[in-house]
Amino acid sequence: MTTRVAIPDLISPSYFPAIAAVELGFLPDAKLELLYPVTKTYEELREGRLDFVGGASHAVLYAFKDWQGARLLCALAQRMYWFLVVHRKFNPKPGDLTVLKGLRIGAAPGPVDGLKQLLKRAGIADVQIGPVPGAVGEKASFGLMAAKALAEEKLDGFWANGMGAEVAVREGVGTVVLDARREGSPEVKGYTFPALVCSEKTIRERPQLAEAAIKAVAAAHKALKEDPKRATAIGERLFPAMEASLIAELIRRDTPYYQHGIALKTVESMNRFAQDLGLLSRPVKYEEVVWTPD
């Protein structure tokens, strides 16, 4: 029986440990699928059409009210993981969010929550946040579409994954204004993180599969830490040539955040964020959010 694993962005470092878990054979009989945006990915999990999703942890709440029916299994990496990139013609400076006033910024459903909240906290208004031109359909590669739209000046900036940011910078089009994982405030870093998620039904009926998935991510973390170049061979199978040549370096940068455990404080900060957004109606306990094998 095939195990269906879906992620909302493929040509990206964001969910790469899930990609590696499948492609390196740590989760036997697993098939990887791309299903964008993450809100749609979690709806498919809720409807029983997927076994596991790698996605933004807080976005589970778009499909599972107050965490009822789903659980986080493990972290694919720690901290919020998107980049804010602005076109160079605006002369943006790293860390200076005031440059965004009046600009058109592209962001995806789910990830956009983190951008809106950090701008609210910084007191930055008058930013036009909307979808990325071209990022439509379930197979969209959001970061690459964002970098393309920026180069074509269909956008003034974007909030997207590390691959989109790297491409925009290397092409001389964009400047990274904020790397949330490394430069955000402690609150911002704690808004969300990439997680592996499954339904309560899977945990109830096939707990051994859920446990195997956690072990597969841990094994992928270990393999990528030992040799980030393993990512290149995977990229060559799944990515366009340029992005395949970049992925190992992006993974090398991310390996310090490759810890699969989910701490209590991580859940607490994520749930505060979700409550601020109105996605979570009440405080919930750690065990209502995270499944831990016996």
Regions of interest found by a model, annotated:
Residues T3-I7, G69-L76, R104-I105, D179, ...:
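A structural signal for short loop-to-beta-strand junctions that line the ligand-binding cleft
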Residues T2-G25, A30-L35, W82, N91-V167, ...:
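Bilobed "Venus flytrap"/periplasmic-binding protein-like clamshell domains
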Residues D29-L32, D126-P131, F239-R252, S281-E287:
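Short, surface-exposed acidic
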Residues R204-S281:
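Secondary-structure end/capping motifs
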